[in-house]
């Protein structure tokens, strides 16, 4: 296993544990992402939440290079939260906060 994969795995294991302890599911969850300010990248993030009750807000950076995407959505479980993070992680240039 590559070092990055191991660190990613450990991060999601800690997140799952924290979400299980701190939250009664289903529950609202706030995702925050930074993506390059390209319409197709923003659309990819938004598309990952199609068919949900997601409230999506975007804001461009001061120079217009990046866009902040905040998404508030009801999730069923910690595993569902993590699955969305993994789903959007394939979008080129995305940063999950």
Which sequence ranges carry the predicted segments?
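Long, contiguous binding/interaction regions
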Residues: 1-68, 74-97
């Amino acid at each position: 296993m590559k070092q990055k994969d191991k660190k990613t795995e450990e991060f999601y294991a800690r997140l799952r544990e924290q979400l299980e302890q701190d939250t009664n599911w289903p529950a609202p969850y706030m995702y925050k992402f930074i993506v390059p300010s390209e319409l197709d990248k923003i659309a990819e993030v938004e598309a990952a939440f199609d068919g949900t009750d997601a409230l999506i807000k975007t804001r461009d950076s001061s120079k217009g290079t990046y866009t902040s995407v905040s998404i508030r959505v009801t999730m069923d479980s910690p595993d569902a939260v993590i699955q969305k993070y993994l789903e959007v992680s394939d979008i080129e240039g995305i940063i999950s906060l």
